[in-house]
Amino acid sequence: MTTPITASGDQPPHANTPQPDNTLPDGPPPGSDPKGAAADNSDKKLSLFRLLLRDKFATVAAAVLVLVGLVAVFGPMLMGDLATKQNLMFANKAPFTLANGWEYFLGSDSLGRSVLGRLVVATRTTISVALPAVGIALVIGSLWGVWAGYHRGWRETVSMRIADVIMSFPSLLLAVVVLYVFNPSIANIVLILAITRIPIYLRTARAESAELQSRTFVDAARTFGARPNAIIGRHVIPVVLPTLLTLATLEFCYVMLAESSLSFLGIGIQPPDVSWGLMVAQGRQYLQTAWWLSILPGLAIVVTTIAANVLAAWLRIATDPAQRWRLALPRKRLIARIPVKTEESK
């Protein structure tokens, strides 16, 4: 192809000018570190497990709860009939000694039964009451609250009035009355504790769902013809679920303490079954001579409750995008970001 010649005989000024290359480079820009960029992206997307390992208190709390769960599942099978086997020759033996065998390491009661075996079996009983009660209340209250908060109107009004009626009665007092009238079995305890805790999840889920139903992504799904149930299942519940799980962790502590209180009053778990609260009640008359009969199961209640509360506090921060950076930063960098008031700034 020939280059056009102007009237003066010169070539146009742009004829020999090299054209710029607008293609994008295949590799990373000069001076950049692709490994460092990948590391930064991975740090921003830390998993909950890695965040848990960064917090020592939350890690210990999770380990305690896992240990309690393992003891509740496998402990009674390993202990056999040790919790009910009586031997008056070993009555009221002191704990923390292996002179009487490993089964009496935590001492024995007035009938010669192993406190260790009874604690293990009581763990399953206490957990088998707390977990179903929390699970039933969580499922019913959450679905009910999300449904009422999304649709608003009369559904929300009726649901809130029902919740107010249930919450107007003290939950523990209502449980005492119901269990006094009916048979105080494990099923009845789970049912009454679950019913009294449903309004907690109902009110929380209703508030979260009512706020989300006017968000842009929910309006977009509604505009494209998505059904209400599909919107609730795909867009509302995943956002509300972390808050409800944190609340369920706290409610687990309350239900466990409520069951222990009912057993202590004599209208909870009944012999021959055994729970932590029942062990505290049965050992209170031996506090001066055999303190371990009440102190050890009481200590199990306290440690489990503290562990669940610590883990719930960590979970609340870990599932909140606005506060999750507190767990991702090292402790030294976190302290460095906190402003310190000096005399000059004052």
Language model feature labels by segment:
Residues S47-L51, S114-V121, T157-M167, V178, ...:
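Short amphipathic alpha-helical coupling elements at transmembrane boundaries
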Residues M1-L138, S142, V146, W154, ...:
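Gly/Trp-centered helix-boundary motif
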Residues R113-S128, P132, R152-M160, Q213-S214, ...:
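Amphipathic cytosolic juxtamembrane alpha-helices at the membrane-cytosol interface
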Residues G75-A83, G149-G153, V178-P184, T196, ...:
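Short helix-capping/hinge motifs at transmembrane helix termini and TM-loop junctions
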Residues F105, D109, I136-G141, V146-R215, ...:
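Generic hydrophobic transmembrane alpha-helix motif, especially the helices
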Residues M167, V178-V181, L193, A207-S209, ...:
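Glycine-rich helix-loop "coupling/hinge" segments at transmembrane-helix boundaries
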Residues V71, I198, L202, E251, ...:
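Alpha-helical transmembrane segments
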Residues L131, G135, V139, L244-F252, ...:
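Hydrophobic alpha-helical segments of membrane proteins
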